[in-house]
Design a protein with these regions (language model features):
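Catalytic cores of secreted or luminal carbohydrate-active enzymes
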Residues: 170-179
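Sequence context of c-type cytochrome heme-c attachment sites
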Residues: 1-54, 60, 65-119, 125-168
Length: 179
């Protein structure tokens, strides 16, 4: 992944004079540098910048507030969720109180971070369906990986009529097997 993104950033920088066309990868794989604005810096260094090592964090999924569609390529809306008191305190002692509050009263944590759409196949489609838009390759739209449609078109989902395999009961969401 790192090689692909760096190569894409280099090519689009030479071609367009900006690295913005490489953002479609970052919506799912590099949200910390993307949403902090660092990803758009042509000099951004994934190896030496701490945000370059963040990867796919808990907040990658749990900061989502809405699934905008099943088109993939990071088609979602995010917002900074409410936090427990002292979560970002400079004091290690106060941060430890915040961690204890999560353990003592996990309902708030669960309510603010686990949304009903997290249990849907559509949620998974936001990142597990990808394509290269014409704006990226200056050619035409190209399908990348697409686990969402494959799931829907399989007998496992219960949506496919002509499948060769049907489980005893259809599986309505990816997370029943994969999480």
């Amino acid at each position: 992944y790192k090689f692909s993104v760096e190569e894409t950033r280099e090519v689009v920088m030479q071609r367009d004079g900006t690295v913005r066309a490489a953002r479609f990868c970052a919506a799912c794989h590099d949200q910390v540098p993307l949403f902090s604005g660092q990803f758009d810096d042509p000099e951004y260094d994934t190896e030496h910048n701490p945000t370059g090592q963040a990867g796919i964090t808990c907040m990658t999924c749990h900061a989502m507030t809405r699934i905008n569609g099943v088109h993939g390529n990071g088609d979602f809306t995010i917002a900074d969720p409410p936090r427990y008191p002292f979560a970002f305190s400079e004091s290690a002692w106060l941060r430890s109180i915040s961690e204890q509050l999560i353990k003592a009263k996990p309902a708030f944590h669960s309510k603010t971070l686990l949304k009903p759409f997290h249990r849907s196949a559509e949620f998974c489609s936001t990142c597990h369906k990808a394509s290269l838009p014409a704006e990226v390759n200056h050619y035409h739209w190209l399908r990348g990986q697409n686990h969402y449609d494959s799931f829907l078109l399989s007998g496992v989902s219960g949506h496919r009529v002509d499948s060769f395999y049907y489980p005893a009961q259809a599986v309505s969401r990816c997370s029943e097997c994969h999480m």
